[in-house]
A protein has these predicted regions:
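Helix-start (N-cap) detector for alpha-helical repeat units in TPR-like alpha-solenoids
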Residues: 86-87, 125-127, 142, 160-161, ...
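Canonical tetratricopeptide repeat
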Residues: 91-94, 131, 165, 199
């Protein structure tokens, strides 16, 4: 599923000089000949129609276009039909970094416009805000990134991917205590990527969580000598069966 650690693996490296592009004047209104549809609730038929014709694997992985010379043209079509299509947003962002262009070849607008359009279309979609936040992180707008990621957390709490990216944002701001907090939140929910933990270790800011109080008490109890008469009964304290010999050790 797209929300998994795949986001961390697919992000391209490098920065693009970015300015803000927002609103219908800069980024176009949302009217479209086909759609726009909410990708979360769109029919399988509509998804297949667009993904099969435009958002193919070769387009998603930025190898080539399907109906145009550039993958950006097919990604643009996909995002005009489904403004909050998460994998298409990720691909448009990565294409921008790959080409080192704010407006990738084949796109109608600069890359930030696609995040703006997705937010205007469905402001309650947490993963639009996650991806927008990741984009802002990549172009060095960290405070804005944190604002987007925190808004996503309010919409979708207890999500390890959100926690991980919040941790990265705070790390880049050198707010290591906050980064550590979100790292623990992410890893407690079994987030698989070790990058944030390794970053914190390199700056000496990583700390393991202490064991929960109940676990600490259990460990202390196990290591203390038992009080007289307090040990639970075992077969060793029961009468030995007649068939036993003095060398046998009864099982607990």
């Amino acid at each position: 599923m797209w929300r998994s650690a795949a986001i961390g693996f697919l992000l391209a490296s490098g920065l693009v000089q970015a300015q803000e592009y927002k609103g219908a004047v800069a980024c176009g209104d949302l009217a479209n000949a086909f759609g726009p549809f909410d990708y979360r609730s769109a029919s399988e038929e509509d998804r297949r129609l667009v993904n099969g014709a435009h958002f193919t694997q070769q387009v998603e992985t930025l190898q080539s276009g399907k109906t145009t010379n550039w993958p950006g043209g097919d990604i643009d079509y996909t995002l005009r039909a489904f403004p909050n299509h998460p994998r298409a947003l990720l691909s448009m962002m990565n294409l921008s970094f790959k080409e080192k262009r704010n407006k990738p070849n084949g796109a109608h607008w600069p890359v930030e416009c696609y995040f703006d359009r997705a937010e205007r279309f469905r402001g309650d979609d947490a993963y639009v805000k996650v991806l927008y936040g990741i984009y802002l992180l990549k172009v060095g707008r960290n405070q804005e990134a944190i604002s987007k990621l925190e808004a996503a957390e309010r919409l979708e709490p207890d999500d390890p991917n959100l926690y991980y990216n919040l941790g990265l944002a705070y790390f880049d701001l050198k707010q290591y205590d906050r980064a550590l907090h979100y790292a623990h939140e992410a890893y407690s929910l079994r987030f698989p990527l070790p990058g944030l933990r390794e970053k914190l270790k390199r700056v000496g800011a990583w700390k393991d969580l202490p064991p929960p109080p109940a676990q600490s008490a259990a460990v202390a109890s196990a290591s203390a000598p038992p009080a007289a008469g307090s040990a639970p009964a075992t077969r060793a304290s029961a009468p030995v069966a007649a068939a036993s010999t003095p060398t046998e050790t009864p099982a607990p």
